[in-house]
């Protein structure tokens, strides 16, 4: 899809430009940093995601919604795990940003679930009206990933309530598992419904 590829290329260029600006202005601190520059790449990326959703097939609005929510959900859980690694090497950092990403993952989960259940969705796979090619096994695997994803988010939030440094290590490990189950939730559904 040409629009998707062009938007991706421009978004990558905008991301690199924001990195260069941040590196050049590093000594000046946060004051005076052009905050709008950080919004250019996500805006262009959204254009690419909409184009990808329209190209995915099926009802256009549902395909776009699934693509946008899926990108936000998988982005939140991936960013949370990556930020968790930063906390492992910088233990004195405040936990607020990590907790915020974990909260966003939990907030996005019901929307991801609803988008994947919306007909024709995973309910059809679980009911057997859509064949997953494995006698229903992928539908049950998807269900397990879905339940495990929100359970791991809840466990991560509980771990981050603890004050010890080991809590951040535990949270990062739980987020590793949450990435696996979140991708299972999203990608298995896409494979079954393709």
Regions inferred by a protein language model and the residue ranges of each:
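Helix-coil boundary and interhelical linker segments in multi-pass alpha-helical membrane proteins
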Residues: 53-63, 128-129
